[in-house]
Amino acid sequence: MANCVAVASADHAAVGLAQGFVQVSHGKSAPLRRIRPGDVVAIYSPVQVYGSRDGLQSFTALGRVQPGEPYQGRMDGGFSPFRRDVAWWPARPVRIGLLRERLSFTAGKTNWGAPLRFGLLRVEDADMAIIAAAMDCAAPFGA
């Protein structure tokens, strides 16, 4: 089992939460092929609305990747983004600013957001535990 942070706007993350999937990098398949069933995924939302610059900068969802491979979904306008099924846990959003000095991938870094630009970032167990605790996630972490 691995842990990763996936990047998606909060409005896109909300659709995934409601329908039980994750999609990243505006629907690209490559990042989703790097995660496996059983992996824990946290969604980091730099913005509330895709295409805006509202500066949300929050973790907005937390869950476990389910069995199966990435697949293409259907959206309006003929857009067919790649998705992966996730069982989402009850969790509250938390701003990354509250955690930045405690997470190994952001602590002490002036350009802390750079590793997140690729849409998916593997993180250590300790980092995911910090994120889950801050989100008040009651799911059995590591189970």
Task: Enumerate the language-model features and the residues they cover.
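Compositionally biased, charged N-terminal/linker segments
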Residues: 1-37, 130, 135-143
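Surface-exposed, flexible loop/turn segments at secondary-structure boundaries
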Residues: 12, 49, 71
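Short, conserved, surface-exposed binding loops centered on an aromatic residue
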Residues: 32-35, 51-57
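Aromatic- and Lys/Arg-enriched surface recognition patch
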Residues: 55-121, 125
